[in-house]
Amino acid sequence: MRKTLFSGVALAAVIAFGGSAWADVLVGIGIPVTGPNAVYGAQIQKGAEAAIKEVNDAGGINGEKIAITIGDDVSDPKQGISVANKFAADGVKFVIGHFNSGVTIPASQVYAENGILEISPGATNPQYTEQGLWNTFRTCGRDDQQGTVAGQYIFDHFKDAKIAVIHDKTPYGQGLADETKKKLNELGTKETLYEGVNVGEKDFSALIAKLKQAGVNVVYWGGLHPEAGLIIRQMADQGLKAQFISGDGIVSNELASIAGPAVEGTLNTFGPDPRNNPDNAELVKKFRDAGFEPEAYTLYSYAAVQSLAQAAKAAGSNDPQEVAKAMKEKGPFKTVLGDLSYDEKGDPKLPGYVMYKWEKGADGKYNYIQQ
């Protein structure tokens, strides 16, 4: 029988809907529970639930316990706005989420109007914190940082390569692709192809034929793992030998399941992996013992709750605007990501992006390893 991870938090979620007397602070977790990006939603949910249990076990925030309500945005902007409006109607004070930048940005505007503070573990589009809103925070980096790292890496390691920049037409995917392209162009490298494809597309044979005809030997992908896995697999099937490089949208072991052995050697940017921090060993073991691998955004979500709880304590208040002020002024906060401070926009002051390579481990499984 599979163990329940951090049991007791699920009870809090149920109680929240029932108007419990003890659950004084309601936190919404806005994520894709269903749809192609549900794996990332699960990471954010598990991380937030585990951290909230830790906070509640220690007495809550300023003497008040935290309850949870979960909203499924299905990675769709319109549904994200519906979730945001439901959270506002339910009296949510703080939101952990959303994942997709295209959902997070419009939802943040609803939250700002309703006095709700939002911390996203995964929205990397710069526009999110460039809106001038009081309530926007993230524990991840930004695509203008990530694209700069990717562009420089490609320039340094693939000189004279013919480069294709491909994206999924979303605020995240196209935004990241454009930032990478911008850096390459600044360095004097012109891409051979720049193409957009549709989210949910399954057959990339026409795209791959175009890549082969152009003699492309480096493919940069701005998008998420479902399409990336298919492109990688179909490139191999159609005999295109090109280096595939992407960003933090492919950091899921599902990528290897979709791409198969062709995933070997794939490169992607992401922040330093907090699972490798010895200070997090006990927590990581706890997740694994419960049958959940805390990869990618799990600990970024955990850190979001830690930041929120410590900022509320520093503010001496659970009022979202007071907590937002404390998050910008009272850091650094002790988190699983390290000592975490936020600037005036709500962006984290964290180490930059690093490069990972997908390799086959001794257990026969593929995983992304920091280079």
UniProtKB/Swiss-Prot annotation:
Q: Which CDD domains match?
A: PBP1_ABC_LIVBP-like
* Record's keyword terms, sorted: Amino-acid transport, Signal, Transport
What Pfam families does UniProt report for this protein, alphabetically? Peripla_BP_6
SUPFAM superfamilies in alphabetical order: Periplasmic binding protein-like I
Concerning InterPro entries, the annotation shows: Leu-bd, Leu_Ile_Val-bd, Peripla_BP_I
Q: Which residues form the signal peptide?
A: 1-23
Task: List the coiled-coil residues.
Answer: none
- In its UniProt record, which GO terms are filed under biological process? amino acid transport
Its biological function?
Answer: Component of an amino-acid transport system.
Q: Which family does it belong to?
A: Belongs to the leucine-binding protein family.
- Recorded protein name is Leu/Ile/Val-binding protein homolog 1
